[in-house]
């Protein structure tokens, strides 16, 4: 029951029909109808789902994949069975059974040829599914109410219908709030500040409208009579409003797409099988078939469901070397969409034959004995008859399908173990054209130290689906990790040619160009990246660093500022590494100092030092203080400059960075000399700097040694005394009270 149906004109009355005491409202038995048909088991199963999904992730996934064979797949087949198993039904819905089916088949072929279509088709399936669930819940609610003789008035029906529609709109707002975390699900990117109050209003409307309608129904009947109606309304709340209610009350975000798929699909499917099995039984009995069997019907649905979902992706993948993962999703989406369309056409209570079977089980179907005598009917009767050949064909077909399903289950079990290398290898042997398996295999081989094999698996994943951007970028990053920079450069060059507007690929391509010495090309690609996405923080940072190295300090500062603003805007959701942020803060302060923005420069250096202290980044805290000291000296704040140098040197004492420490002591010595402090302190600091660099030869040591010699010459004979105890003077220098001359 996939649509929110309208009542027949003759039933739209302003006064309620009196309840009938002769009609039985139940389909099977009260406990089965309430539990399965009305969804009373939703709450305990959803709670169990949250627990097991977190505690037993792999087992829970496998359980769902197996349940798909018993409920999800058969429920699709139930619709196919209903519309294709007789000539009358086939012709009645010909536009759906033939024309729509052919259009969807063409869409499937196009999607296999053009991967970019898959996200659109898959998003349509994801967004249509909740509407389908809503329509079924509402249709069953109306069925139970009318079977109990408590037909809702037009106002009551409208209130219930609008409340159910409101719950669906609420769910769609949740789906389309913010960016999508799944490449296959497109989002409108609505702002939470707009959707949150809208969702709250829709939730209140659902409670108010449905509450009023249910209260009105209760007044003219009794609680037991409308218990199925109450239960279905509660089920709609659990399926659609509960996540929003949790988010509104606690502020904890729940992924609605995950919540609304998986277990909800199983609950919906079992509900569908419950009502269709009743309908098929009543229809068969009305047509004079006294041999109808639920077990035979269920086996038919299971076998047919397997045929709908499993062979197609395997055949396309193995024969045409298409990506099994993409093919499976394509078949899943299109079979679902066809099911939604068919379901909306065939399940309408205004159809007199459906109403006769679902609302009044005593009436006869007008279809009884009306089967056309033609070749289609004859073939159908032979295939379903008792002839040995027909029976053997049925058994053989079912056996093949069940074996195929078993192989598919085994493939899923092996591929779901992310760290079990032998299992993943067996899954890859079953189907080497499965990009998902190849990616997991690559990760497992990387962990096992088999780097060449891991890279080969990633290459297979990328080659089996060249239109998948994520796979191509993953392969490119794998090449970088393997040190094959030239190959990675070529790979990202291909990616840019196919996806010129992908900011991440432009950033990686620019980085590779820089590492291979193509600096102009690197800057060009980073500029393209920030043009595509100004919030691409890495591109802003790399571009700033490149411009800084070229001496374009102010141009670099502009990009540093954008980088810092971007990081600050998303820090709560995606904290960045503190090192680049601190370095950027210092660079921006340097740029402010260069153009005499003294207040901004001072705040920038102080902020960098304070942030570094809180983050435990001692090296960068020292660097910020040294830059601050140099700035303070230029601003004639000699006392402040001395204190900044001394704080930096005290921090350096706890670091193991001889070059930076020696450089800071050298700069402090030069500062003391410029401020005409006693030469013995200058010499002691230079001697200390030189001693730190003794085991680190290079240009720094040469410069420091030259400065020490010049200071020693100025100091004369007193230098000998300093050499005997340089440590004492070094310690004293950290407490000098240096003031302006």
Model-derived regions: residue spans:
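Canonical positions in the second alpha-helix
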Residues: 427, 460-461, 494-495, 528-529, ...
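Single-residue signature of alpha-solenoid repeat helices
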Residues: 420, 454, 488, 522, ...
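Register position in tetratricopeptide repeats
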Residues: 447, 481-482, 515-516, 549, ...
